[in-house]
Amino acid sequence: MIIRSPEPEVKILVDRDPIKTSFEEWAKPGHFSRTIAKGPDTTTWIWNLHADAHDFDSHTSDLEEISRKVFSAHFGQLSIIFLWLSGMYFHGARFSNYEAWLSDPTHIGPSAQVVWPIVGQEILNGDVGGGFQGIQITSGFFQIWRASGITSELQLYCTGIGALVCAALMLFAGWFHYHKAAPKLAWFQDVESMLNHHLAGLLGLGSLSWAGHQVHVSLPINQFLNAGVDPKEIPLPHEYILNRDLLAQLYPSFAEGATPFFTLNWSKYSEFLTFRGGLDPVTGGLWLTDIAHHHLAIAILFLIAGHMYRTNWGIGHGIKDILEAHKGPFTGQGHKGLYEILTTSWHAQLSLNLAMLGSLTIIVAHHMYSMPPYPYLATDYATQLSLFTHHMWIGGFLIVGAAAHAAIFMVRDYDPTNRYNDLLDRVLRHRDAIISHLNWVCIFLGFHSFGLYIHNDTMSALGRPQDMFSDTAIQLQPVFAQWIQNTHALAPGVTAPGETASTSLTWGGGELVAVGGKVALLPIPLGTADFLVHHIHAFTIHVPVLILLKGVLFARSSRLIPDKANLGFRFPCDGPGRGGTCQVSAWDHVFLGLFWMYNAISVVIFHFSWKMQSDVWGSISDQGVVTHITGGNFAQSSITINGWLRDFLWAQASQVIQSYGSSLSAYGLFFLGAHFVWAFSLMFLFSGRGYWQELIESIVWAHNKLKVAPATQPRALSIVQGRAVGVTHYLLGGIATTWAFFLARIIAVG
């Protein structure tokens, strides 16, 4: 840490009334671009309008103006999020069986949507139990509401209205900070201030207030709910806050107030700030007292972190100093120059944030099932499967987005003249080594992982089970994974002596938590089948990385096209007369990377879905005998490609295929429709622009004959537009097909 004289204080950080509010301007399509504002000559105009509306770089080159637009757009985004949340809470208040579910969460399904009877649509309202007819929801909102202490639909109404007010506030803020008081560029670039406020404010105080809410409201209410008290009898949230005796009845140390805190006698608080590990056997969720303790600890950490960076007081860390001091023996100038990149290129900044947020989202997916945080979440199999699938897809998209914006940074913001021998320059200089090695890894992983399956299929077909790779023949046990599992299972007695159980039941240790006769979680065994599919995961992760990284590292130049930077981020080919230069733009790498991201995530969610149904989810008898949904068939069936097709895709598709005439029929229709959307994408991906232009001209001729030709000249989609439409429908169709397949299956059997 360096102590130096105070920084010169920045006085005026905003411009007043920089841009007048003009509805006339907003009403004019394409007002942000001289070309588009002229109006349409051809149908390409509408595509350009959509492509460039949010590409602020194309509106102006003034970084301050771009920053203000992005900042303002963030408020718009927050407004939409609040609106969405408000809708969710309103549905919970108006159309749901939340209060009934609260009284019996194990036998009543969550529902917050009732379909109107139009032409037989009432068939979609299934019986979710408790005399309620509706669509079973799988978002996990009911479980979150219970965990936060919501006991009535009135409280949901109030929260929904509160979210609407916040949405309006955000819309106002977006307008105000662009038109009335717009921050100067220096404000956006003041990273130390930003870090302090985000760390201490958002994460620190945010976690602290949540911990406070949990201790004062959630814990007592959940204590009553777990004991079977009728929600209408439970005191309201404000009563605990105003009346300490209510809390003291449940947690006696509350009677002492803050005395133990100031006398450092903190163990007094261990009644409601626990360190138990494992799951609450009543609800099948993490101990809420553990969660409160966790948020309090996180709050302390981030409140400290929010005081580490140097602002007006001349004390603390400076990010530029930290980055420039970051040199290794083999890294030349190290991180020198990165500070300038990250404060002048929002694409570079966004790229890092997307990569980290995407990875974090995937980590969330894995923790939601292994450490289910909310009461009765673990036994709601449809919600568990939905949450895992959702977070995996989102994570995949965010990571591809990271590569996209890294490439845009390379094309638009990277200045090679003042970058020499820093880390980025060194990576770019040995990009051939990186990409060729990565290519080798992909080929190795692809052939070997798939080869293991093909070997098994062949041996199985030839009737030689003793020669297959399986737990009963030639074993390929994941020994490292099993060692990690075992280490964690033993942790409570050894490395974490304060804990009573390990962080997750999945590690092992033999104990099982069941709620209402359903398995919440148990130790997950790993064997040869998992070893095989994990190598497919390794393969399908490395391929999109290869494609995307190649796109970033060769975004500005390559041996094939040395002046690629001049052609921009997206272009179809390097002009006429240069054959073999199509699909080389950075945009095309993102386009191709998306398909492999789709492959990668699909394998992960298939693996998860089948593994959980086979080895975890199921019912438990009074004698303690567990019957899994698919009876433990994963270990022997998933070791061949044929097994995946026959015992997973085909066997488990029976519910969605046979859903017609039942309350699940919407999933059957979606399954059909999404297949159609997916197939529709192939029309865009497999045909060229000229084919359609020819067809269009013949259709225009017919219109001219009938004197109904439009003034705007119809044009075929450009090559890039066609690919964009194609990949969108491919992903949308594929994801919606999987969604219908998963939900019809798990709602029927779960």
UniProtKB/Swiss-Prot annotation:
<dbReference type="GO" id="GO:0016168">
    <property type="term" value="F:chlorophyll binding"/>
</dbReference>
<feature type="transmembrane region" description="Helical; Name=III">
    <location>
        <begin position="195"/>
        <end position="219"/>
    </location>
</feature>
<keyword id="KW-0560">Oxidoreductase</keyword>
<dbReference type="Pfam" id="PF00223">
    <property type="entry name" value="PsaA_PsaB"/>
</dbReference>
<feature type="transmembrane region" description="Helical; Name=IX">
    <location>
        <begin position="589"/>
        <end position="610"/>
    </location>
</feature>
<dbReference type="GO" id="GO:0009535">
    <property type="term" value="C:chloroplast thylakoid membrane"/>
</dbReference>
<feature type="transmembrane region" description="Helical; Name=VI">
    <location>
        <begin position="385"/>
        <end position="411"/>
    </location>
</feature>
<keyword id="KW-0934">Plastid</keyword>
<feature type="transmembrane region" description="Helical; Name=II">
    <location>
        <begin position="156"/>
        <end position="179"/>
    </location>
</feature>
<keyword id="KW-0812">Transmembrane</keyword>
<feature type="transmembrane region" description="Helical; Name=I">
    <location>
        <begin position="70"/>
        <end position="93"/>
    </location>
</feature>
<keyword id="KW-1133">Transmembrane helix</keyword>
<dbReference type="GO" id="GO:0051539">
    <property type="term" value="F:4 iron, 4 sulfur cluster binding"/>
</dbReference>
<keyword id="KW-0479">Metal-binding</keyword>
<keyword id="KW-0411">Iron-sulfur</keyword>
<comment type="function">
    <text>PsaA and PsaB bind P700, the primary electron donor of photosystem I (PSI), as well as the electron acceptors A0, A1 and FX. PSI is a plastocyanin-ferredoxin oxidoreductase, converting photonic excitation into a charge separation, which transfers an electron from the donor P700 chlorophyll pair to the spectroscopically characterized acceptors A0, A1, FX, FA and FB in turn. Oxidized P700 is reduced on the lumenal side of the thylakoid membrane by plastocyanin.</text>
</comment>
<dbReference type="InterPro" id="IPR006243">
    <property type="entry name" value="PSI_PsaA"/>
</dbReference>
<keyword id="KW-0460">Magnesium</keyword>
<feature type="transmembrane region" description="Helical; Name=X">
    <location>
        <begin position="664"/>
        <end position="686"/>
    </location>
</feature>
<protein>
    <recommendedName>
        <fullName>Photosystem I P700 chlorophyll a apoprotein A1</fullName>
        <ecNumber>1.97.1.12</ecNumber>
    </recommendedName>
</protein>
<feature type="binding site">
    <location>
        <position position="691"/>
    </location>
    <ligand>
        <name>chlorophyll a</name>
    </ligand>
</feature>
<keyword id="KW-0813">Transport</keyword>
<dbReference type="GO" id="GO:0000287">
    <property type="term" value="F:magnesium ion binding"/>
</dbReference>
<comment type="subunit">
    <text>The PsaA/B heterodimer binds the P700 chlorophyll special pair and subsequent electron acceptors. PSI consists of a core antenna complex that captures photons, and an electron transfer chain that converts photonic excitation into a charge separation. The eukaryotic PSI reaction center is composed of at least 11 subunits.</text>
</comment>
<feature type="transmembrane region" description="Helical; Name=IV">
    <location>
        <begin position="291"/>
        <end position="309"/>
    </location>
</feature>
<keyword id="KW-0004">4Fe-4S</keyword>
<feature type="binding site" description="axial binding residue">
    <location>
        <position position="683"/>
    </location>
    <ligand>
        <name>chlorophyll a</name>
    </ligand>
</feature>
<feature type="binding site">
    <location>
        <position position="692"/>
    </location>
    <ligand>
        <name>phylloquinone</name>
    </ligand>
</feature>
<keyword id="KW-0157">Chromophore</keyword>
<feature type="binding site">
    <location>
        <position position="582"/>
    </location>
    <ligand>
        <name>[4Fe-4S] cluster</name>
    </ligand>
</feature>
<keyword id="KW-0150">Chloroplast</keyword>
<feature type="transmembrane region" description="Helical; Name=XI">
    <location>
        <begin position="724"/>
        <end position="744"/>
    </location>
</feature>
<feature type="binding site">
    <location>
        <position position="573"/>
    </location>
    <ligand>
        <name>[4Fe-4S] cluster</name>
    </ligand>
</feature>
<dbReference type="GO" id="GO:0015979">
    <property type="term" value="P:photosynthesis"/>
</dbReference>
<dbReference type="GO" id="GO:0009522">
    <property type="term" value="C:photosystem I"/>
</dbReference>
<keyword id="KW-0602">Photosynthesis</keyword>
<keyword id="KW-0148">Chlorophyll</keyword>
<dbReference type="GO" id="GO:0009055">
    <property type="term" value="F:electron transfer activity"/>
</dbReference>
<dbReference type="InterPro" id="IPR001280">
    <property type="entry name" value="PSI_PsaA/B"/>
</dbReference>
<feature type="transmembrane region" description="Helical; Name=V">
    <location>
        <begin position="346"/>
        <end position="369"/>
    </location>
</feature>
<feature type="binding site" description="axial binding residue">
    <location>
        <position position="675"/>
    </location>
    <ligand>
        <name>chlorophyll a'</name>
    </ligand>
</feature>
<keyword id="KW-0793">Thylakoid</keyword>
